Amino acid sequence: MKKQHLPIECAENGRKAGRQVLLKLLIMIVCAATVFGLFGGCGGSGENNPTDAPTPAQTIRPTAAVPTETPMPTRAPLVYSPDYHKTTPLMTKLVGEQAIKAARMVIDAFLKGETSVKFGFDSYEPTFAMNTVFAVNRMCPPFTAFALCNDYRDFDASTGVLKWKIINVEPNELDEKLQKFEAVAIDFMSVLREGDNETERALLLYSRLTAYAQYDYEAYENPQNLTEDEYIYRTSAYSVMCDGMGICYSFAEAMTFLCAQADIDCIEVNCINDSIAHQWNLIKLDGEYYYCDATWDVGGTFNYFGMTTDERVKDSGGIKAEDMRSLSVSPEELLDGVVPSDTRFAVLREHVTSMPVTVEIDRVNDRAVFTVGNESYSISCGN
């Protein structure tokens, strides 16, 4: 299967309702301007289009670093059930403790089939509703797919009440959709074992998502053929996890949810400018920060896992470090001046370039073993 880049699109708050509609329309206009001339299209246009660059050699070189000892499972299967209250430190830092507390209240009400919640806080910042809904959509993907909530229109600061309406499902069928998602989440997490470290967990979940899901070209290229509610569903993390179809912020939100469930610090990052509109993830592994782009690794590759800022910007079709944002916050501001620069995973872009790639964890030696056909390459997962 030949590697091809995917279309680029993004939405900062992800929902095509109220204020978000304008943002998504802007994104679609940017993407429409860039997609001309692309083969399956992502990025800018013309001679500098990264999709026009030669595809990396479809080879994977063996290395003596691959252990000769047969990996043996040494850890028990992970005991897991979905926890919609879990979030990440980066998310909490981005939106604030009050928004996280409010998000948990919204989630609890939604899971009961309710369509409003009264918060009862003493005061509300102007960005309170936006931050709360942003957090809810990442902590509870079913809310994104089956609830329509405009953070400004549907919040009344004078009463502290936030409202939403159920969409894409009959109210009496919501429980069935929740059960489906929870079963899928359990299946995703089944690749992990008790005691797996952060790097092992991240590699396994990333591989599970990129090898399973596909890019939804129809939703991206022909949104006019979908109703607003259908578009919300098709571009949700719920869709990419349950139906195996999504676009860039579907993949990015799914990674944020999965990482939160696996106790990995993670948040989405986007870039919107005249050349590109795209969304991916910022992830923290063993004390270092990296960028990961599951959308561009669809098919089960690792070309965009564990990138530095320089690697993220290089051959990206127009991504610029100064245009990167989580909500309205730059990654550098979010990380208190830290710029992702650790090159630990650069070897993957040198040695693991074919698709599909399978990854297994040698838990005896704490190594990740990447295999294509009969050839393998391994890296250390140790701290």
Describe the role of every protein-language-model region:
Residues 1-74, 205, 243, 247-250, ...:
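Gram-positive cell-envelope targeting signals
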Residues 96, 113, 197, 216, ...:
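Helix N-terminus capping/helix-initiation residues
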Residues 236-238, 245, 288-294:
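Short, well-ordered strand-loop elements centered on a beta-strand within folded domains, enriched
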Residues 174-240:
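Secondary-structure boundary elements
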Residues 10, 31, 42, 102-103, ...:
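Generic recognition of cysteine residues
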Residues 167, 195, 241-245, 249:
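Short, charged/polar micro-motifs that form catalytic or ligand-binding hotspots
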Residues 34-37, 41-199, 203, 315-383:
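N-terminal accessory/pre-domain segments preceding catalytic cores
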Residues 250-315, 370:
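Hydrophobic/aromatic-rich core segments of domains that either
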